[in-house]
Amino acid sequence: MLVTSPPLMPPVAVPASLDAFLAGIGPRAFRFAEAGLRQRDDALDAVQDAMERMLGYRERPAEEWTALFWSILRRRIIDLQRRRSFRLKFWVPQEDHDQDSTIDWADEAPGPAQTHEQQREYALLVQALRQLPARQREAFSLRVLQELDVATTAKAMGCSEGSVKTHLSRARDALQKQLEATR
């Protein structure tokens, strides 16, 4: 099931340069931003802004880049969400924003039936993630989907490690209930 703990990964080597770090984290950052913003263009803007801001921190030790980048990206996503809700609050009903979010499916290797099932399960997961409170969604995305450790997730979210564990536990419980209800 999708809400179980991921297998322990071997320690990731520290990238040799900031360019290599940004190139490696870009696709995951885009998926994270797209899940939070629900619009492809806004997600691309948020990731680009976060990468540009990271250039100002290139002198920091490479071990700090991961937590720093996710923290910058998370704050940028929150800023864009606030601006969008303020600007569009009076002009467009909120329901219309969810209708135009599309998902790209790049994996062509599996057969049609398997691809359809993966798409359905992913759509259910995305829908369930969108129903979570923001902090629980962030904790789940950073900890499980992005495979960050608890300390790095706590730094990125600006909270304690205990809060990360609490948010993650509640997110997993809620996701498991929602996903079991759809089966």
What are these regions (language model features)?
Residues 29, 33, 43-54, 69-72, ...:
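Short, small-hydrophobic-rich alpha-helical interface motif
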Residues 16, 98-127:
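Acidic, proline/glycine-rich intrinsically disordered inter-domain spacer in sigma factors
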Residues 74-93, 118:
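Arg/Lys-rich amphipathic alpha helix in sigma70-family domain 2
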Residues 130, 134-135, 146-163:
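Helix-turn-helix DNA-binding module
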Residues 1-12, 16-18, 89-91, 155-156, ...:
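C-terminal edge and immediately downstream basic/flexible tail or linker adjoining helix-turn-helix-like DNA-binding
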Residues 2-31, 35, 41-44, 60-61:
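A short, charge-rich alpha-helical start-of-domain segment used by transcription regulators
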Residues 139-143:
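A short pre-motif secondary-structure segment
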Residues 11-12, 49-65, 83-85:
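Sigma70-family region 2
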